[in-house]
């Protein structure tokens, strides 16, 4: 096989690179650091490049039965010398001050342009506040910067209480009270946590509500449903007012009716707990039954209770017979007055009936009666006779009719006034 490897760079006789097959922009050469596309002066030292294209021998080669002839190096040199000179050339040797290896410094420093000729550059509103010498600005502030004060937060271990994870269900009143005493003695280590405070407040409210509930046995576990039932019963009993026919609530929650006037005078305080109130009512019922059997004449028993639930004193009063004022005595004078008014009215009606002559009662006309008895002036028109005619011309008859109606209205007004003033 023929040797297709390129010769070493020492065999190169020219400083320029041969023309490449593809087109590459000059800017891409400048960015990559390949400045060998420029024609270097004769005084420049020899700079071997890794981008040199391989030079092939002048001997013709056969590739798959075809003869390929490569151009000679002398022809390449003559072609490059006859070509026009490029526009750009390197005036100074490139310096390498960048920390990145192989990257030369820029030929034109844009910061120098902004400092020397600031009027040529239009400042944008986004870059107005940025200083020109940004590196110096950062370096000056970096030396005089105050170190930041770091606050090391203390990581507290969560002291989880196992009682908070369990459901809120007290085993007994004694265990609940001991637990609450222990909670009061403990300091609030987790005061910053909001959830622990909320749970503690709920437990405290539950303890205060369950403390006054009647518990049958201390050792036996109680169901919270039973406690809620008893609390509802006690709240209903506290809202009820004690009446002559009141009720007694025992520990089992049943309501037993008590007939009689034995709980009329029972005095109790609303601040007393429900358990003491129920116990006092049970004791009162038993004492009432005993007293009823011993002394059936006792009318009422008065019993006072203190806030502690202890009975202060009890009294037993015997009934005494008293003369009750009857209801009719209050209206005796009213009835006597009304009866006297009615009697007087009857007497006046009888007198008027006696004064009416027989001719008018028989139905004879009024002018005949006037002719027969002209001297009689006391003529009264009968109100009950419909057949008797009324003489409108006679003034005497109209005045008598008005007097009679006025008397009746006056009697009715007096009777009504008496009843109104008495009430």
UniProtKB/Swiss-Prot annotation:
**Cellular component terms per the entry's GO annotation:** cytoplasm
Kindly state which keywords UniProt assigns to this record, in alphabetical order.
Cell wall biogenesis/degradation, Cytoplasm
Q: What is its main location?
A: cytoplasm
**Pro residues composition bias: which ranges?**
1-10
Q: Which domain of life is it from?
A: Eukaryota
Localization recorded for this chain is: Cytoplasm
Please list every transmembrane segment annotated in the UniProt record, as residue ranges.
none
Biological-process GO terms, alphabetical: fungal-type cell wall organization
Ranges for the region named Disordered are 1-25, 46-69, 156-178, 369-405
Answer yes or no on keyword Nucleus.
no
Compositional bias per record (Basic and acidic residues), positions renumbered to this chain: 392-405
For whether the record's keyword set contains Cell wall biogenesis/degradation, the answer is yes
Could you share any additional remarks the record makes about this protein? Present with 259 molecules/cell in log phase SD medium.
Its function, per the record, reads: Involved in cell wall composition and integrity and response to osmotic stress.
Q: What is this protein called?
A: Protein HLR1
The primary gene name is: HLR1
């Amino acid at each position: 096989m023929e040797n297709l490897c390129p010769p070493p760079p020492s065999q190169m006789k020219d400083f320029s690179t041969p023309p490449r097959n593809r087109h590459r922009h000059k800017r891409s050469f400048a960015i990559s650091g390949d400045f060998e596309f420029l024609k270097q002066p004769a005084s420049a030292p020899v700079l071997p490049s890794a981008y040199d294209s391989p030079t092939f021998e002048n001997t013709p080669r056969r590739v798959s039965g075809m003869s390929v002839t490569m151009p000679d190096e002398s022809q390449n040199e003559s072609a490059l010398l006859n070509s026009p000179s490029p526009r750009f050339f390197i005036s100074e040797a490139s310096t390498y001050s960048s920390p990145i290896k192989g990257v030369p410094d820029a030929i034109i420093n844009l910061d120098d342009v902004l400092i020397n000729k600031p009027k040529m550059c239009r400042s944008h509103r986004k870059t107005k506040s940025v200083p020109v010498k940004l590196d110096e600005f950062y370096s000056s502030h970096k030396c005089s910067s105050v170190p930041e004060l770091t606050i090391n937060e203390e990581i507290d271990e969560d002291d989880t209480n196992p009682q908070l994870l369990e459901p809120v269900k007290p085993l007994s009143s004694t265990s609940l009270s001991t637990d609450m005493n222990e909670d009061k003695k403990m300091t609030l280590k987790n005061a910053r946590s909001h959830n622990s405070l909320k749970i503690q407040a709920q437990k405290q409210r539950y303890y205060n509500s369950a403390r006054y509930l009647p518990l049958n046995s201390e050792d036996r576990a109680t169901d919270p449903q039973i406690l809620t039932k008893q609390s509802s019963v006690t709240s209903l009993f506290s809202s009820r007012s004690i009446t002559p026919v009141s009720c007694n609530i025992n520990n089992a929650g049943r309501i037993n009716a008590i007939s009689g006037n034995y709980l009329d005078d029972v005095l109790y305080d609303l601040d007393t707990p429900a358990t003491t109130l129920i116990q006092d009512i049970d004791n009162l019922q038993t004492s009432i039954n005993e007293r009823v059997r011993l002394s059936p004449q006792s009318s009422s028993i008065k019993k006072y209770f203190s806030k502690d639930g202890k009975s202060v004193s009890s009294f037993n009063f015997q009934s005494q017979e008293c003369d009750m004022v009857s209801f009719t005595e209050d209206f005796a004078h009213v009835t006597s007055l009304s009866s006297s008014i009615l009697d007087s009215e009857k007497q006046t009606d009888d007198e008027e009936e006696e004064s009416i002559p027989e001719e008018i009662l028989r139905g004879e006309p009024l002018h005949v009666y006037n002719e027969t008895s002209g001297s009689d002036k006391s003529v009264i028109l009968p109100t009950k006779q419909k057949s008797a005619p009324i003489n409108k011309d006679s003034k005497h008859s109209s005045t008598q009719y008005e007097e009679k109606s006025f008397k009746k209205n006056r009697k009715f007004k007096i009777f009504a006034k008496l009843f109104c003033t008495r009430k």
